Amino acid sequence: MTLPNKAALVGLAHTLSEQVKRYLVTADETKSPEDHKLCIEGERTPSSTEHAQAWEIVRTCDRIGSLVHGPVPWLLSNALSHLDSACLAAATQLNLQDIIVDGPSPTSLDTIVTATGVSEDLLRRILRGCAQRFIFEEVAPDQYAHTDASKMLRVTGIHALVGFSCDEVMRSAAYFSNFLQQTKGKPPSWNVPSPFSLAFDPTKGLFDYYSTVDEVRGRRFDLGMGGTEATKPLVEEMFDFSSLPEGSTVVDVGGGRGHLSRRVSQKHPHLRFIVQDLPAVIHGVEDTDKVTMMEHDIRRRNPVRGADVYLLRSILHDYPDAACVEILSNIVTAMDPSKSRILLDEMIMPDLLAQDSQRFMNQIDMTVVLTLNGKERSTKEWNSLITMVDNRLETEKIWWRKGEEGSHWGVQQLRLRK
């Protein structure tokens, strides 16, 4: 094993100490729960500063780990990291989060064997794989307890999201190299073919597959995406809807069953909302006095001409650039340059060198690549995409949640130059 660079290791240890100090100061400055939006099971969403500082600590710890492991063990550990997901997938499938008691006394392996019907040997190895990642804990031989992370598996949305990640995403990842060979490394213009379609059905993209073939996985996906929504800032926390004139029309493009529009309409009753989505999505949803449901395919020209706002929340990250150009072009043709704007409510990844980026953001980006040919975009990549749509279209402003300026989530306001 190669001895680590002593000077580099000492320097990183000092960096880590300083980063932890800064992080604790930032965390202490949180005066009350009201300073943050509370999300899943009382877990608060950290401020953008706290979030960034936390990931700096994680990155420094990883750099220390790479040094002390040495290059070959570090390389192999990363190559085999999917085995952690395999153990976590088994744990969630067996519902170990419900079998293991959250209380003062641990749960015995015998109890888990009786509840699951799985052998002692396999359960030990599954739980060992999880516990090494601080998901469950063996507090005494064959005695298991919860950790903060494993408790979160009891939350429906998180359990579903983990299931999706360890099933559809992991299967799709196994086909990524096949996908690159088949497409010669050129991204398709829409969702098929994709690593997901190669893994599940070569003729169908993820959403089509869920709606026509596998409704069980589809329901789990919906629950999981609901869990992620709880961690994102609300669009009305970023964009000031009260600034729109009385009677303005907001078109919620790809707005699902209208949950967002109904929520915002209750806070801003002076506005009129039109929710557009596919017939199967909006089927059975009734109009209200402020919210109208409309059948629409984003691959067609938008039928609502001259609306004040065309809102897209978490839509474009599901598609490659060519598809996004088509989607936005179909809106641009309907815009009134004198008043219309497009609001893109999406993740905005920081423009950083690869090794300085946040691993979790990269994992989200790779998730949409593998399952949808999608893409999480940086400021530079968003600007490049917008330029491809129409040379008149430009980003006029980015709206952030108060106190979160420059964070990883914002609302980009696009207008046509007159």
Swiss-Prot record:
Residues where S-adenosyl-L-methionine binds: 254-255, 277, 297-298, 313
Enzyme class: transferase
Pro-peptide positions on chain: 1-41
EC number in record: 2.1.1.110
Single Gene Ontology MF annotation: sterigmatocystin 7-O-methyltransferase activity
InterPro entries, A to Z: COMT-like (IPR016461), O_MeTrfase_dom (IPR001077), Plant_O-MeTrfase_dimerisation (IPR012967), SAM-dependent_MTases_sf (IPR029063), WH-like_DNA-bd_sf (IPR036388), WH_DNA-bd_sf (IPR036390)
Positions of the catalytic residues: 317 (proton acceptor)
Reaction catalysis annotation: sterigmatocystin + S-adenosyl-L-methionine = 8-O-methylsterigmatocystin + S-adenosyl-L-homocysteine + H(+); dihydrosterigmatocystin + S-adenosyl-L-methionine = 8-O-methyldihydrosterigmatocystin + S-adenosyl-L-homocysteine + H(+)
Residues engaged in binding substrate: 170-176
Swiss-Prot/TrEMBL keywords: Methyltransferase, S-adenosyl-L-methionine, Transferase
Chain segments carrying region Substrate binding: 206-225
GO biological process, one term: methylation
Gene3D superfamilies from the UniProt entry: Vaccinia Virus protein VP39, Winged helix-like DNA-binding domain superfamily/Winged helix DNA-binding domain
Role: Involved in the conversion of sterigmatocystin to O-methylsterigmatocystin (OMST) and dihydrosterigmatocystin to dihydro-o-methylsterigmatocystin in the aflatoxin biosynthesis pathway.
The protein's name: Sterigmatocystin 8-O-methyltransferase
